[in-house]
């Protein structure tokens, strides 16, 4: 009986410790999610703003049958500057920010969560994931972010290829599309987007994480220097965008159909039209050379900013 009396307080003490431990763990998890969201949002905003003029020029070529060349691209940039002013090179960037900030925040925080879940499942808690789960985590993160923010991507594309008179601001785009074309138009081009995001996000995160893992193994340093992170991110962007680029062209055509003279069509029909009218390589890879300039810069800035912000926030929390 005496043992029962002793066991009661002991069990109560153990239960209290378990509840307290669970509460601390839950708060830590919430802080990690908020930290990832904030770091991802800043990373996306900085990266996209840095390459916004090149991004707008790329979209203009993607949605037209005009042949791409570096000379023509810089001519478009120059005439846009002359006719509409310097800040017009960032036209549509406000719509880009409205999309990119939540997109990047969701993508990076989802990637951290998927890494944790897959790492726990495969028994790699606290360590680098093996190759296939690493690729899978990136693909899942990109798909999650694209699914939740797609209408904002369509709005950004519309603003990039139309004159100011057609759409005055982001809300005007939403109102006109909803009224004149129907709400379902806001998800026109969604399937090629997801099909493109899977290899793009999967390969980007996979390449970046793999290069960081190899760096730790061969350099003996736990953390790369910022310029090394930029190089790893640039390589990740180059590989990811090259793999998914044809689907990027298809989604832009589908998103801007109705305002660029092209009829609305399915993925297969859009692909056939591009190949028939412009050729497989010229049509589906139009503007890729510009992406090889802007993509590595944007992805390098994005991954580096996210990592450095995570390190800073962890330091402040500790």
Swiss-Prot record:
Gene Ontology annotations of biological process type: ADP transport; AMP transport; ATP transport; coenzyme A transmembrane transport; pantothenate metabolic process
Entry keyword set: Disease variant, Membrane, Mitochondrion, Mitochondrion inner membrane, Repeat, Transmembrane, Transmembrane helix, Transport
Reaction(s) the record says it catalyses: ADP(out) + CoA(in) = ADP(in) + CoA(out); 3'-dephospho-CoA(in) + ADP(out) = 3'-dephospho-CoA(out) + ADP(in); adenosine 3',5'-bisphosphate(in) + ADP(out) = adenosine 3',5'-bisphosphate(out) + ADP(in); AMP(in) + ADP(out) = AMP(out) + ADP(in)
GO cellular component, one term: mitochondrial inner membrane
This protein's record includes keyword DNA-binding: no
Transmembrane segments: 33-53, 89-109, 135-155, 186-206, 230-250, 293-313
Topology class, membrane: Multi-pass membrane protein
Compartmental location: Mitochondrion inner membrane
MF terms in GO: ADP phosphatase activity; ADP transmembrane transporter activity; AMP transmembrane transporter activity; ATP transmembrane transporter activity; coenzyme A transmembrane transporter activity
Xref: InterPro entries: DNA_mismatch_repair_CS (IPR014762), GDC-like (IPR002167), Mit_carrier (IPR002067), Mitochondrial_sb/sol_carrier (IPR018108), Mt_carrier_dom_sf (IPR023395)
Disease: Metabolic crises, recurrent, with variable encephalomyopathic features and neurologic regression: An autosomal recessive disease characterized by muscle weakness, developmental delay, lactic acidosis, and encephalopathy. The severity of the clinical manifestations is highly variable even within affected individuals of the same family, ranging from asymptomatic lactic acidosis to severe developmental regression, epilepsy, intellectual disability, metabolic crisis, and multiorgan involvement.
Known role: Mitochondrial carrier mediating the transport of coenzyme A (CoA) in mitochondria in exchange for intramitochondrial (deoxy)adenine nucleotides and adenosine 3',5'-diphosphate.
UniProt-recorded name of the protein: Mitochondrial coenzyme A transporter SLC25A42
Gene behind the chain: SLC25A42
